[in-house]
Structures are given as structure tokens and as C-alpha cells.
């Protein structure tokens, strides 16, 4: 009887091992490789939710008004809030600014005192948003006027332009689908 139990346990263990549910291999397309960033937040979170989380977190950290922080994201990469399910943050501008907040690599290196790669800055939402909010705070501390800050964020020199007015007047009026 004991040997029958041992055989039954061994057969049961073999069946469990054979029929265990494992995670299927994730099929990556070119667009998901750019957007799904494991070190940013859990792999299952859409980029729009990652953006929402990190903008709120770092705007609070650097004391940036939320509507301005979200206004920059909207002006730079057309971010439309947490329900913007097809949002692609891994964009590159014609001027070579990268990522969701369109930060230049040289600016990121200067602000963060590191040697960040263009690809990391472009694809890591957390790092890109952090860099953007840190830059906005530094510019505001120097200039004292949000419109001038937004103009400088956009052009690299202190000014008030159409972009500055767009961000300054941005309204949080997202619609849930």
C-alpha cells in the first residue's frame, strides 16, 4: 500500500509539473519593445498610466503645478491623460529631443550629472519625466515666470512664444472613453 501511495504521489507530481500553467512567451512587436519598460513600472501598465503616475509623483516632488506638467506632456507628445490607451511615449523630434517629455540628451546629462544614453532617455518614462520636472524647477527658480520657463524649455533660450502660451493655458479636461 505504501509503495502504491509513493507511485501515486510521484505520478501526481509529474502530472502537476507537466500541466502547470506557465506564463506564455510575450510576443514583442517593434512598438511594444519601445514602450514596455520593466524597470519603469510593472510590465502590464500601459504607458499612459505610467505617465500619469510619474508626472503626478515628480510634479509633487519638484513643486510643479500639475496642469503645467501635464501641459508640457500634451504639447510635446500629445499626451491626453491616463485613458490615452494608444499613447506612444518613445518619440524622437526632428531636433533630437526624445521620450515623453521631449528632453535633449545633453540637457538630461547636465541636469542629472550622468552619462545617460539616448535610447534610455527615450524609452524610460520614469527617468524622462523626472528629468523634465527637475529641469522645470531649475528654470523656474532662475526665471520666476512660468511663461518664460516654458519658452526656454521649448527653445533653449528664455522667451515667451506660442508654445509657452499653450502650456501656460493648458486645461486638464480629459474624457474617460
Language model regions located:
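N-terminal Sec-pathway targeting helices
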Residues: 1-13
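Extended, non-core accessory segments
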Residues: 4-7, 19-20, 114
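Polar low-complexity intrinsically disordered regions enriched in Ser/Thr and small residues
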Residues: 11, 15-16, 102
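Short hydrophobic alpha-helical membrane-entry/anchor segments
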Residues: 17-26
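Catalytic glycan-binding domains that act on GlcNAc-containing polysaccharides
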Residues: 25-177
Amino acid at each position: 500500500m505504501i509503495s502504491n501511495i509513493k507511485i501515486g504521489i510521484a505520478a501526481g507530481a509529474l502530472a502537476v509539473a507537466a500541466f502547470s500553467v506557465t506564463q506564455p512567451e510575450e510576443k514583442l512587436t517593434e512598438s511594444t519593445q519601445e514602450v514596455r519598460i520593466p524597470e519603469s513600472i510593472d510590465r502590464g501598465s500601459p504607458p499612459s498610466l505610467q505617465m500619469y503616475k510619474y508626472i503626478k509623483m515628480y510634479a509633487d516632488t519638484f513643486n510643479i503645478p500639475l496642469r503645467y506638467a501635464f501641459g508640457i506632456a500634451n504639447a510635446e507628445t500629445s499626451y491626453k491623460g491616463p485613458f490615452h490607451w494608444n499613447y506612444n511615449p518613445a518619440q524622437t523630434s526632428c531636433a533630437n529631443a526624445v521620450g515623453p517629455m521631449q528632453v535633449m540628451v545633453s540637457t538630461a546629462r547636465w541636469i542629472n550629472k550622468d552619462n545617460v544614453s539616448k535610447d534610455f532617455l527615450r524609452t524610460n518614462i520614469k527617468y524622462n519625466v523626472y528629468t523634465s520636472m527637475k529641469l522645470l524647477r531649475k528654470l523656474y527658480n532662475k526665471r520666476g515666470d512660468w511663461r518664460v520657463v516654458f519658452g526656454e524649455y521649448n527653445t533653449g533660450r528664455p522667451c515667451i512664444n506660442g508654445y509657452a502660451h499653450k502650456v501656460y493655458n493648458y486645461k486638464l479636461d480629459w474624457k474617460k472613453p
